Amino acid sequence: MSRTPLRLFAVFFLGLTLIACSKGQQTSTSDKSQQILRMTIGSLPGTIDPHQATDSPGIKVLAALNEALLTTDYQTFELKPGVAESWQVLDEGLRYRFQLRDNAKWSNGEPVTAQDFVYSWQRMLSAGLGNQFALDYYVIKNAGPYHKGELKDFSQVGVKALSERELEIVLERRDPLFLKRVAYEVTAPVHKATVEKHGAMDDPTNKWIRAGNHVGNGPFKLVYWELNQTMRLVKNPHYWDADAIKLEEIQILPVESETIEERMYRSGQVHLVYGSRLPVDKIAYYRTEKPDEFFSQTAYATYFYLFNTKKAPFDNVDVRKAFAYSIDKKLLTGSITKNHEAPAYALSPISASYQPPQMPQFNPALAREHLTKAGYPNGQGIPRITLTYNTFEIHQKLAVAIQQMWKRELNVDVALENQEWKVFLDFRQNLQHFIARAGSSSTFADPLDLLGSLTTGHGMNDTGWSNAEFDRLIRASYEAADDSERFALLHQAETILLEEMPLLPLFYYNYSYLKKPEVRNFEFNMVDHPNYKGVFIDAAASR
């Protein structure tokens, strides 16, 4: 069932008329006297709870509202101090100590302490909350048993407050990415009194994240957020590095259409289109006519489809291979996406340090062989199949093209279904799909980050697929002596992934953005992660 027409009309009306709402007066980019950044991010986030967020819009908002122990310079991937002003790596990478800065405060003015992190990491690892990234932190001593409910006493988990300003984390095994994980916003602290005022610590429906309730420790604080209305974040005066924050406010408009985003930009209603994708028919125009406002960024990210391996016919690997080998990816990137994307024949992007194995390229004859082997010659007898994607024009265009390829090459009819973002995320995570659109970027620009999400039981594994040898190789990569050995193990794991084909890589992203000249110091990067420090509106730049 599609809700696209009504949804697009509502968004179109929103995009072309500046709506004033209670508690939130919107501005226009024509008013250059205020330090207010107006932007779109593809859609509003599914949640702004750091221990539940998984989507790109959510992470972009969390970067403004929350801060973890460390931060990352996403131009160089160098780790920087966050709440922790310094840190030590001890016992050959099995013990970490973080010294928290004295002036770290919550948005209500209270100090951020080491005990806040103990509470927050206990919450992050609580089974009832449903944290999708919890498995990534099983390297912490007893984190796995606690998350599984086998251990009830969190004091036995390797997260301890040694003092008000010193936090210690003890691991059971080394993790080459651990400090990078510590710098990710999903590990940011939450304010205990605020969380428990509005519900249980591990209640996923807790209302503490609502405007008026929310307390964070990032450079901005939430003041307004209602369904289908502009989200407003204002500067947090208690943030420890408040002098580096030049913006007084960020306004994020609720748009789930790249066409409407571009129209709003063109009409001066937003400074920044930051949803990672522009309308295909506008890319060439901005690239040639307004190159100073158009930004294209090669991304460490992959666009792919997920097969539900728990549901027929995709419980059969030959069906998955048939559907995978019948896609002409070069046609998709050359005729539909048109932003110089590279076709993907693996989940992991190719980099200087890691060359992933490659699946077969477009091979309709081989695809038909696999479909026949699965018992569906010429598509006969195959169950009804639906491809589900979230509402966005480019997803629809790609889905229609791929639907036609499956019909032409396999004689299989596939229905299409689009859903709004939050509905789509729940639908996919609950394995209700046959085939679902997905996209994944590594916050760390590392293949382990992508491949690790396909291990058994990982909260981001929306395929239902499980392979013991794949899991073993991923675990072994944590203990590798060096990157050469680590990447060799990951290569073996990815070879299994491509042989089992629980997902279908389509292409590697090239992000495309629009930014007004008056927006200064906003930098784009290969993992689509914002840094709001130092960003300001330069009124003189638009004159």
Name each model-derived stretch.
Residues 40-91, 215-216:
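N-terminal lobe/hinge region of extracytoplasmic solute-binding protein
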Residues 227, 341, 374-442, 457, ...:
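Ligand/substrate-recognition segments at binding pockets and active sites
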